[in-house]
Amino acid sequence: MSDLSHIRNFSIIAHIDHGKSTLADRFIQMCGGLSEREMAAQVLDSMDLERERGITIKAHSVTLHYKARDGKTYQLNFIDTPGHVDFTYEVSRSLAACEGALLVVDAGQGVEAQSVANCYTAIEQGLEVMPVLNKMDLPQAEPERVKEEIEHIIGIDATDAVACSAKSGMGVDEVLERLVAVIPPPTGDIEAPLQALIIDSWFDNYLGVVSLVRVRHGRIKKGDKVLVKSTGKVHQVDSVGVFTPKHSATADLKAGEVGFIIAGIKDIHGAPVGDTLTLSSTPDVEMLPGFQRIKPQVYAGLFPVSSDDFEDFREALQKLTLNDAALQYEPESSEALGFGFRIGFLGMLHMEIIQERLEREYDLDLITTAPTVVYELLLKNGDTIYVDNPSRLPDLSFIEDMREPIVQANILVPQDHLGNVITLCIEKRGVQRDMQFLGSQVQVRYDLPMSEVVLDFFDRLKSVSRGYASLDYSFVRFQSANLVKLDVLINGEKVDALALIVHRDNAHYKGRQLTEKMKELIPRQMFDVAIQAAIGGQIVARTTVKALRKNVLAKCYGGDVSRKRKLLEKQKAGKKRMKQVGSVEIPQEAFLAVLKVDS
């Protein structure tokens, strides 16, 4: 058995903007992963979108060699993880490949709900969590208060948390020294049959599927025939290697290491994330416990603007699904928008990111319908069905009970802003479960309807608390609610893509707001366009987009009134005929207006 004591696998847990990507850059710089010229800010956030929004979306991995003060050279395999609530599954995947995690906390802001949630995930998976206080060079840093928060809120010892500043590079070497000392080396047997976990896969147009793997036992080298356990297919390995952060091929990957494998897999679903790889000569190696499949929380229809793009859209989705295990989709057709897909997302940020990636990376023009959550319906005949699309809602006479998903929201907020946050939660039909005062922060738990949370709760929470509140939520149960379907009719015709499922108490208000919003967005036609919101057969709100009309009396100078009346009647008849055959073009903004209806 070869010695694995020089390997350390770790990931970084941090809230958005607490500086984990910058810390990663310092690690790469100190260990000489890239030359000065190649060093760019946020090296690992390689997607343009990640840089623009300043967030990490995908997990990335880097292998670095660090010469410690004890004279040994350690191999550090570091997996960068996202910090946003929508991407928690990326985090759990990264953690499954590590023995330890750095909990990076901004010394000025203190602990945030997101880090708490990810930290618990790490502790549940048995990882060694090592606290690091970042941004110590800022004047508002309060290390003692933050250490106390870490101990209070998360419950891990923070007396000897390392203080550093990733931006200036101060104390980063201390972090590395401490890391080598605290985080345990991996366990594994190089001589045993190969057993490797796929952490991530993505599709490269030239190489096929590239998989990021963590080898548990055995070794894998170029030319080996590997077996994908879940599909039973065998592939020949073309190359193995590590990211330093550049692609660099190595002779082999051994137990305890993290690196990439390219095996010329052309089928997009050939190497599913969370799967186990082994050699074809030892097919009976056990599957490694993968990751639980995560259920999408929010569904929306995406339709290509021109129907010719449908096939390209399908292909783009397949490639994205490979890289993003949480994405689920099925074909859907709409009378108003033609053919497209109903796609399941983890949250609104995830939905925006995916839409932007489809439009940028695959050059598609898409229309998105309003996102909805999954409702549970109990029918009169005793069946239970789940509906994620308002247009698929059965007739109300068949429904015994409608239940909406409830989430438990865990909110951390400074005491000064507590009142505003509670007001917001009550407005969103929340029920308070628990409140704890932790130093200057308050931890509040609320049960909230998921439909209220996914739309704009996060943005509203940030604005009422001046950006200080942080949120983490998880699905708890389905609960009976008085829900109705709100249809939008344009010129008396239902537009299926604009339907919403809303709570009866808010239905009139939402209907009014929606019709007002649509009135601003639908361009004026040559005839009046009536926009109505209806619940069943009852119209609850209506607005009219007034017609454009030509002044037909311009050519009459004075003269008899009957002459003018004749011209006006003629115009009226023409408009009436036009209205019977005319169709109304609905712009993309109108579909998005449904999202922006303030609750």
From Swiss-Prot:
The keyword GTP-binding applies. It is an enzyme of class 3 (hydrolase). GO terms for cellular component: plasma membrane. It is found in: Cell inner membrane. Residues 5-187 form the tr-type G domain. PROSITE patterns: G_TR_2. Keywords: Cell inner membrane, Cell membrane, GTP-binding, Hydrolase, Membrane, Nucleotide-binding, Protein biosynthesis. GO terms for biological process: positive regulation of translation. Its main location: membrane. Its EC number is 3.6.5.n1. GO terms for molecular function: GTP binding; GTPase activity; guanosine tetraphosphate binding; ribosome binding; translation elongation factor activity. It is a peripheral membrane protein. This is Elongation factor 4. It comes from Stutzerimonas stutzeri (strain A1501). The lineage of its organism: Bacteria, Pseudomonadati, Pseudomonadota, Gammaproteobacteria, Pseudomonadales. The gene is lepA.
